[in-house]
């Protein structure tokens, strides 16, 4: 089973490639979150591989993913292989450790973490911008080979080897990421007036 979260399509492309190669069904985390359940329960087979595919946001996992995991139950989980595949513009920091900790709280053990470098697409903070066209094209050309390596590693029950931590991961993932999560993608910028019609758009 492949749980995936995607914003611009990078992680969806990776998830589809993994699904086709490994024969595991896709589950959209965004779609599941919109169902507003008290929790998310899924049966897993004894031989099932469980994958989480998602983007790195400021050197940490997309918050929708950790929110989903915080209320996730895998019925029949007895230690099956669980993999994290994150897409990033350049480096992931300790995203693997953060996702592993989130899973551990649900009594799920992370087997291995992998990463795929894809075009940068975050532009809302100073110093962030999309890649130059040649860099973007190079990343897109390199991505299929990287995904193929990850598929082979999963088939061979490989451990962490195809993951790019980058420089100063502690600073980026344990200091910058929490600030980003609180200030950049929180609800502080929203306000409600009498014009609100409760359409729910602001919560999507």
Please give the residue ranges for each predicted region.
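FMN-binding flavodoxin-like domain, especially the glycine-rich phosphate-binding loop
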Residues: 2, 8-13, 17-33, 41-54, ...
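Cysteine-centered iron-sulfur cluster-binding motifs in ferredoxin-type domains/subunits
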Residues: 190-204
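Short, charged alpha-helical interaction segments and adjacent helix-coil junctions
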Residues: 185-188
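Local sequence-structure signature of Cys/Sec-based thiol-disulfide redox active-site neighborhoods
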Residues: 1-4, 192
């Amino acid at each position: 089973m492949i749980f995936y979260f995607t914003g611009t399509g990078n992680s969806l492309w990776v998830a589809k490639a993994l699904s086709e190669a490994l024969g595991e069904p896709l589950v959209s985390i965004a779609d599941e979150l919109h169902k507003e359940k008290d929790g998310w329960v899924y049966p897993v087979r004894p031989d099932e591989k469980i994958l989480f595919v998602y983007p790195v946001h400021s050197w940490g996992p997309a918050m929708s993913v950790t929110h989903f995991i915080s209320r996730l139950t895998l019925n029949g989980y007895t230690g099956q292989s669980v993999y994290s595949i994150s897409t990033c513009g350049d480096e992931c920091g300790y995203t693997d450790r953060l996702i592993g900790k989130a899973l551990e709280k649900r009594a799920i053990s992370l087997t291995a973490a992998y990463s795929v470098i894809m075009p940068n697409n975050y532009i809302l903070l100073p110093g962030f911008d999309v890649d130059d066209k040649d860099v973007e094209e190079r990343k897109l050309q390199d991505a299929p080979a990287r995904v193929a390596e990850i598929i082979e590693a999963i088939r061979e029950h490989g451990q962490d080897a195809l993951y790019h931590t980058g420089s100063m991961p502690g600073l980026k993932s344990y200091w910058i990421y929490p600030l980003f999560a609180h200030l950049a993608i929180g609800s502080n910028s929203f306000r409600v007036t009498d014009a609100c019609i409760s359409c729910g758009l602001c919560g999507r």
